[in-house]
Amino acid sequence: MAKKVVSVIKLALQAGKANPAPPVGPALGQHGVNIMAFCKEYNARTQDKAGLVIPVEISVFEDRSFTFITKTPPASVLITKAAGIEKGSGESAHGKVGSLSRSQLEEIAKTKLPDLNCTSIESAMRIIEGTARNMGVSISD
């Protein structure tokens, strides 16, 4: 018989840098999960993606065991890294803070494709392009 899921916890953590301090400790501690076991496993799985924020979805079972799924980094993080900017524009309609080429946009779309609600690269590129436009990043051909 399958274990019963008691809770699903969603966190966004720096790759390879999870530690028992907040936000990880309190989120997992209230469900009785072994915090250090999670931190070690998460850090081992994400150490090759250092410098990125990696969302994680933790399923906690009634016997206090857990499994987790790592997602792809948020589109905004990938866009800021590719454009070489620190953050998006406060007024995206007026102030452009950077630009991306079509090839960079396609690379980000390929990275995000498993987590997006689409199947083709073209539609994934349109989704990422909309995110970039809202951040004040222009797309050049």
From Swiss-Prot:
GO terms (BP aspect): translation
Family annotation (Gene3D superfamilies): Ribosomal protein L11, C-terminal domain (1.10.10.250), Ribosomal protein L11/L12, N-terminal domain (3.30.1550.10)
Domain of life: Bacteria
PROSITE patterns listed in its UniProt record: RIBOSOMAL_L11 (PS00359)
UniProt PTM: One or more lysine residues are methylated.
GO molecular function, one term: structural constituent of ribosome
GO cellular component: cytosolic large ribosomal subunit
Keywords of this entry: Methylation, Ribonucleoprotein, Ribosomal protein, RNA-binding, rRNA-binding
Role according to the record: Forms part of the ribosomal stalk which helps the ribosome interact with GTP-bound translation factors.
Assembly with partners or alone: Part of the ribosomal stalk of the 50S ribosomal subunit. Interacts with L10 and the large rRNA to form the base of the stalk. L10 forms an elongated spine to which L12 dimers bind in a sequential fashion forming a multimeric L10(L12)X complex.
Family membership: Belongs to the universal ribosomal protein uL11 family.
Listed name of the protein: Large ribosomal subunit protein uL11
Gene: rplK
